[in-house]
């Protein structure tokens, strides 16, 4: 994971040095100052960028340079939580007591989702009934889609399909939605067939690089394009064209990353094995 993070963070550092980030001005035009304006609005330091890339994002969730890196801490440390649970409680009768205690401990953290995902994959008495109930799985599929689409920023949902949901549970809607959706997909052959089409397999292949790159493209090229073209074409048409261009550029850069950057992880691992 680290080599790709490092390469992209170096690109972000250079973009900041060159003054290519125009997200603050674009946020004013788009009316999204509350979320989009504050990213990368500081003087970059090569040393702090290295710290974030090499260990900060994995151990502490540091994401000053690349805002999306906060999830890597959850995935990295969360995996060790799952490994520990599997080693200590796998197949044992008392595991549900341990699961309940861990759930309470993690209740107000972002690790709750990855822990519940592990629990969902373990064996339990009535799991087979849930897996084989087609109607219930389609219902979970629909419910999962609904909750996964809850506005991620936690605001701007008034008057939408999600406006009826109490704000007090905002931190749990996506977790609940993902659990329902993934469980349903694992048990619905027709959905699996649809998601097995080449376009989805390709997006899965480039997903890691695409995730790390997309915000860089949006905050630099996307913001510049919006500010430059909007006075000529109007807001709506400019945003539509911008969406297409951002998507093409992001996918293209992700493909290059998959071919030439991500393999560095394998080479680094092989080198360490030889030592």
What label would you give each PLM region?
Residues 109-202, 216:
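Alpha-helical transmembrane segments and terminal signal-anchor/GPI-anchor hydrophobic tails
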């Amino acid at each position: 994971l680290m080599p790709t993070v490092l390469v992209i963070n170096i690109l972000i550092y250079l973009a900041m040095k060159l003054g290519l980030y125009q997200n603050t001005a674009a946020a004013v035009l788009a009316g999204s100052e509350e979320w989009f304006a504050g990213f990368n609005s500081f003087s970059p330091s090569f040393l702090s960028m290295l710290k974030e890339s090499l260990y900060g994002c994995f151990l502490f969730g540091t994401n000053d340079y690349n805002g999306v890196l906060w999830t890597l801490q959850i995935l990295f440390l969360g995996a060790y939580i799952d490994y520990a649970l599997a080693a200590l409680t796998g197949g044992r009768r008392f595991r549900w007591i341990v699961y309940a205690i861990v759930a309470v401990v993690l209740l107000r953290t972002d690790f709750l989702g990855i822990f519940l995902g592990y629990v969902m994959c373990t064996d339990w008495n009535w799991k087979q009934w849930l897996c084989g109930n087609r109607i219930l799985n389609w219902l979970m599929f629909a419910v999962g889609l609904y909750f996964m689409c809850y506005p991620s920023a936690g605001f701007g949902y008034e008057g939408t399909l999600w406006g009826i949901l109490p704000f007090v549970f905002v931190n749990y809607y996506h977790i609940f939605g993902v659990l329902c959706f993934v469980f349903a997909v694992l048990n619905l052959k027709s959905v699996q067939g649809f998601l097995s089409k080449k376009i989805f397999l390709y997006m899965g292949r480039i997903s890691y690089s695409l995730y790390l790159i997309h915000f860089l493209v949006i905050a630099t090229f996307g913001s510049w394009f919006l500010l430059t073209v909007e006075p000529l074409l109007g807001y709506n048409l400019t945003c539509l064209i911008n969406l297409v261009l951002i998507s093409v550029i992001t996918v293209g850069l992700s493909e290059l990353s998959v071919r030439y950057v991500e393999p560095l992880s394998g080479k680094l691992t092989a080198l360490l094995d030889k030592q």
